[in-house]
Design a protein with these regions (language model features):
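Short gly/pro/ser/thr-enriched loop/turn and capping motifs at secondary-structure boundaries
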Residues: 1, 59-61, 124-127, 156-157
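Mid-domain Rossmann-like dinucleotide-binding core that forms the NAD(H)/NADP(H) cofactor-binding site
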Residues: 2-77, 81-82
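A general structural signal for well-ordered alpha-helical segments in protein cores
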Residues: 10-13, 104, 172-176
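Glycine-rich cofactor phosphate-binding loops and adjacent beta1-alpha1 units
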Residues: 20, 70-149
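Structural detector of well-ordered beta-strand residues that form the stable sheet scaffold
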Residues: 29, 52, 116-118, 149, ...
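The conserved SAM/SAH-binding core of class I Rossmann-like methyltransferase domains
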Residues: 54, 120, 194
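C-terminal substrate-binding/catalytic core of Rossmann-like NAD(P)-dependent dehydrogenases/reductases
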Residues: 84, 88, 131-190
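C-terminal capping/lid region of NAD(P)-dependent oxidoreductase domains
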Residues: 118, 127-128, 181-193, 200-221
Length: 221
């Protein structure tokens, strides 16, 4: 039962897989290894990809490894070279889970020709860059012809429908099955189990002490 609350976050993470072209044997990088990024990385691995998790936080990288992510890379300077070395030149899919526009733009160079960038984290904050250069990475064959995709979960219907393969309900059912079988690992992500009266402290920790607070559960009884 303590694992059930993670279903909601894992369903969000699954959206990135549903819109991707990830297949067995592909290389996938995930930028941002918070709850959603961690689970997106795990799901990509379950789909048969070699996954590279990227984060500035050593603690989050350590948690990703505890959840079965075989390759982790420190974000920042030198990350591009390390990712490309693991991915034999570039990843086929990059899942951007931080929501930081600068990270999305700078990680385009990590992607191989005809690869894809999946925006899982909702972009926020102002960021100025050379848009022409970015658009050329999408448009020009010599620059990669990279495909950008949005992974906002509400692109899918809530209820199951015989004419639509994916839905939020179906994704949740899949997640339940993965949690039950132990294939999706979330136990290492539980950092705190708190009383409801400690909600303010929990939200403060999640906002301001992200290395200490990952998955916070409330004990209601």
């Amino acid at each position: 039962l303590p694992l059930v609350p993670f279903t909601r976050m894992a369903t969000v993470a699954m959206t990135s897989l549903r819109v991707s072209t990830i297949e067995l044997g592909d290389h996938v990088a995930v930028t941002g290894l918070g709850l959603i990024g961690n689970m997106a990385a795990q799901l990509a691995g379950l789909q048969g990809a070699t996954v590279i998790g990227v984060d500035l936080s050593e603690n989050r990288r350590r948690l990703a490894e505890a959840c079965g992510i075989s390759h982790t890379v420190a974000g920042g300077e030198g990350a591009a070279e390390r990712v490309k070395a693991i991915a034999e030149g570039g990843v086929g899919t990059l899942i951007e889970a931080t929501g930081v526009p600068q990270v999305a733009v700078e990680s385009v160079s990590w992607i191989r020709q005809y690869g894809e960038l999946i925006l899982l984290g909702s972009p926020r904050g102002r960021y100025e860059t050379d848009v022409t250069d970015l658009l050329n990475s999408v448009h020009l064959n010599g620059r990669g012809c990279i495909t950008f995709k949005g992974a906002h979960e509400w692109r899918f219907p809530v209820e199951e429908d015989p004419f639509v393969k994916h839905s939020l309900v179906r994704n949740s059912k899949v997640v339940f099955g993965l949690l039950k079988s132990g294939r999706l690992r979330v136990e290492p992500l539980i950092s705190h189990i708190l009383a409801p009266e400690e909600a303010a402290a929990a939200y403060d920790g999640l906002k301001n002490r992200k290395d200490e607070y990952q998955g916070v559960l409330f004990k209601w009884v």
